[in-house]
Regions:
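Short, helix-capping/interhelical loops that line the mouth of catalytic, cofactor-
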Residues: 111-113
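N-terminal pre-domain/capping segments
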Residues: 1-100, 122
Length: 123
């Protein structure tokens, strides 16, 4: 078995807080990723969602898609609705040949809501 290493684009661009790395071009993220020696990258918010466009973009840097984060909402919608909502994301991952799906329940997350202290317990 061989091991390949991928990286998350959050090291350059923060999808939750765009002011952190918001001016970093996607081309910089991808060229740095390849130059560092990674062979893949996790799906990020600025990546195209069209499978062919994403495949071509990553391929132009010699990269593969290694997985993709998904912010779930099971506390605010039922499981059937959540499963239906994540289908486009799963289809994109499958089309790009990755079998890594990162699911995080984020319905009541407060990390992006600056008006709420981080020590408040989600309700």
């Amino acid at each position: 078995m061989s091991i390949r290493f991928g990286v998350s684009p959050i090291a350059w661009i923060n999808d939750d807080m765009p002011e952190l790395g918001g001016d970093t071009p996607l081309s910089t993220v991808l060229s740095d990723t390849a130059e560092i020696g990674f062979t893949g990258i996790e799906l990020g918010g600025r990546f195209p969602r069209d499978p062919a466009a994403l495949h071509n973009l990553l391929g132009s840097y010699g990269l593969d898609l290694v997985g993709g984060w998904y912010s779930g909402n099971l506390l605010t919608q039922d499981a059937d609705a959540e499963i239906a909502a994540l289908q486009p994301h799963l289809a994109l991952l499958k089309a790009l040949g990755t079998d890594v799906f990162v699911f995080a329940e984020t319905s009541n997350a407060i990390h992006c809501r600056k008006e709420i202290p981080l020590n408040d317990t989600p309700s």
